[in-house]
């Protein structure tokens, strides 16, 4: 695994160096990397959160601006919510500009042959990853030994990940 592996405390030190009001993008539904989101929320006063179908448990305080095309249960009580009406089939295009990530959080399997899998929830993340690579965004993977390695569009080369954090959930 050639990715820089750190623990959650070290991740918080990295995140405290982030300036401005970054947009953090991650998967929703069953693969939301909640420990990573909690670390982001502890370190950043104000940030934008782009997630399709955010589950209960994501940060919803005033300094977190939810941006989504599908209001999941985690966004319904957010103090700041920007809903963008869009067909889900067109949602990946939003990651080229309007939802372009400054920080991309992935929830992945452990590596196999130089790649990880986004496992059970891929959604629009391949488009977000391509945008992150083009923009030089920070890509952080929550590497979870319990996440299955699933083939398909959710395969990610480990070279595309800047930081890995092992979290077994």
Model feature map: region roles:
Residues 2-169:
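Conserved alpha/beta enzyme-core scaffold
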């Amino acid at each position: 695994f050639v990715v820089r592996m750190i623990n959650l405390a070290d991740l918080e030190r990295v995140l405290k160096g982030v300036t401005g009001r970054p947009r953090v993008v991650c998967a929703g539904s069953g693969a939301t990397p909640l420990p990573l989101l909690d670390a982001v929320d502890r370190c950043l006063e104000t940030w934008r959160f782009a997630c399709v179908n955010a589950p209960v448990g994501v940060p919803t305080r005033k300094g977190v601006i939810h941006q989504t095309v599908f209001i999941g249960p985690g966004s319904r009580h957010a103090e700041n919510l920007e809903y963008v009406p869009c067909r889900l089939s067109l949602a990946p295009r939003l990651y080229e500009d309007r939802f372009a990530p400054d920080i991309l959080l992935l929830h992945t399997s452990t590596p196999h042959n130089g790649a990880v899998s986004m496992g059970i929830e891929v959604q629009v993340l391949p488009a977000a990853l391509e945008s992150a690579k083009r923009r030089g965004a920070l890509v952080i993977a929550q590497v979870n030994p319990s996440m299955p390695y699933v083939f398909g569009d959710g395969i990610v080369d480990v070279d595309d990940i800047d930081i890995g954090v092992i979290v077994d959930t």
